[in-house]
């Protein structure tokens, strides 16, 4: 019998047995910054053409120089948060416990983006936490609260704070939510994410510069996702992942079945549909449409579901 060449899985296992364990703490294109288990940072590249790592991944890597290496294998993930559109898919973070969705009273926040972020978290079984910042700017505070009433009624926690005007109070309330957890901070630009990072992570600007230099991303310090360890003095560990601000949150990768279960108010009604393959759009005997007619499901939420379902049906090259 002729022995064939070892497959990729065997190849990776063989290399993994001699590699080191590390944590991906930053990603920019195909460049990754990996933190060694015993300390120290290396710039690493994936083996092969595809970029398969995400910030928060635990990996096996081989050092190829004092400060460089190659990722041999990504260890099994608990979850992977990513966004996608019709043309590409972008990994945001892996192995996270919580999604912090940063909003502000001013400028006005996108309710569409909020809804999509909640759906993304729900689809993975990850806890979302809505942060309403800039509550000291009272001109639009009540409007913001009114817009968030729907989400409070659905059971989503909303934390109100003012990072700029009341930093000590903001620090206290946020520390209680992030200590001991791996959280990712997402949101539109202008909501106060940078101020929040400076509040929670001492020396964050210096860390960001170091990461940027090691990734060779130069001045593009806001275009990569990065992980920060929470202060050891908190006594509970934990990490905070910061992602670049964005204006869209595509979820083209979610299937019809994943979408309908990512709306918590839909779940109790799914068994009431007359047809097993009901799409909850215009089918007779639909439990979701019936609940909406009774005022138990908000039309805005159903409109978001319908839009996401339409997007999921678009042909994708990835």
Swiss-Prot record:
Essential cofactor(s): Zn(2+)
Annotated binding of GTP, by residue: 133-136, 187-195
Enzyme class: hydrolase
KW Secreted (keyword) present: no
Pfam family, one: RsgA_GTPase
Listed Gene3D superfamilies: Nucleic acid-binding proteins (2.40.50.140), P-loop containing nucleotide triphosphate hydrolases (3.40.50.300), Probable gtpase engc, domain 3 (1.10.40.50)
Keyword Membrane on entry: no
Positions with biased composition (Basic residues): 1-16
Domain CP-type G: residue ranges: 84-249
Cofactor remark from the record: Binds 1 zinc ion per subunit.
Gene Ontology annotations of biological process type: ribosomal small subunit biogenesis
EC number: 3.6.1.-
Span list, region Disordered: 1-21
Chief place where the protein resides: cytoplasm
Gene Ontology CC: one annotated term: cytoplasm
An MF annotation (GO) of this entry: metal ion binding
UniProt-annotated binding residues for Zn(2+): 273, 278, 280, 286
Location within or outside the cell: Cytoplasm
Keywords of this entry: Cytoplasm, GTP-binding, Hydrolase, Metal-binding, Nucleotide-binding, Ribosome biogenesis, RNA-binding, rRNA-binding, Zinc
Known function: One of several proteins that assist in the late maturation steps of the functional core of the 30S ribosomal subunit. Helps release RbfA from mature subunits. May play a role in the assembly of ribosomal proteins into the subunit. Circularly permuted GTPase that catalyzes slow GTP hydrolysis, GTPase activity is stimulated by the 30S ribosomal subunit.
HAMAP family (alphabetical): GTPase_RsgA
Family statement drawn from the similarity comment of this UniProt entry: Belongs to the TRAFAC class YlqF/YawG GTPase family. RsgA subfamily.
NCBIfam families assigned: ribosome small subunit-dependent GTPase A
Protein name: Small ribosomal subunit biogenesis GTPase RsgA
Organism: Ralstonia nicotianae (strain ATCC BAA-1114 / GMI1000)
Source organism phylogeny: Bacteria, Pseudomonadati, Pseudomonadota, Betaproteobacteria, Burkholderiales
Gene: rsgA
């Amino acid at each position: 019998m002729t022995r064939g060449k070892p497959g990729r899985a065997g190849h990776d296992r063989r290399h993994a047995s001699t590699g080191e364990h590390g944590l991906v703490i930053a990603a920019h294109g195909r460049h990754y910054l990996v933190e060694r288990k015993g300390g120290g940072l290396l710039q690493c590249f994936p083996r092969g053409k595809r970029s398969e790592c995400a910030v928060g991944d635990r990996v096996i890597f081989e050092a190829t120089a004092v400060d460089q290496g190659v990722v041999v294998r990504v260890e099994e993930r608990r979850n992977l948060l990513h966004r996608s559109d019709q043309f590409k898919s972008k990994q945001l973070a892996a192995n996270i416990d919580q999604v912090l969705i940063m909003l502000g009273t001013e400028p006005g926040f996108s309710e569409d983006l909020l809804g999509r972020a909640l759906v993304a978290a729900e689809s993975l079984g990850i806890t979302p936490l809505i942060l309403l910042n800039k509550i000291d700017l009272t001109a639009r505070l009540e409007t913001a609260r009114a817009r968030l009433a729907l989400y409070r009624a659905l059971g989503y926690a909303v934390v109100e704070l003012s990072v700029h005007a009341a930093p000590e109070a903001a620090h206290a309330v946020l520390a209680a939510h992030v200590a001991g957890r791996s959280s990712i901070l997402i949101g539109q630009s202008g909501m106060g994410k940078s101020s929040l990072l400076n509040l929670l992570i001492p020396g964050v600007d210096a860390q960001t510069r170091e990461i940027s230099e090691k990734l060779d991303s130069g001045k593009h310090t806001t275009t990569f996702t990065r992980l920060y360890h929470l202060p050891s003095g908190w006594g509970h560990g934990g990490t905070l992942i910061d992602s670049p601000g964005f204006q869209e949150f595509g979820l083209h990768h979610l299937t019809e079945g994943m979408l309908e279960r990512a709306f918590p108010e839909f779940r109790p009604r799914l068994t009431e549909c007359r047809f097993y393959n009901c799409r909850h759009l215009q089918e007779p005997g639909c439990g979701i449409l019936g609940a909406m007619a009774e005022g138990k499901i908000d039309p805005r939420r159903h409109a978001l579901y319908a839009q996401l379902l339409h997007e999921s049906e678009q042909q994708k090259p990835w």
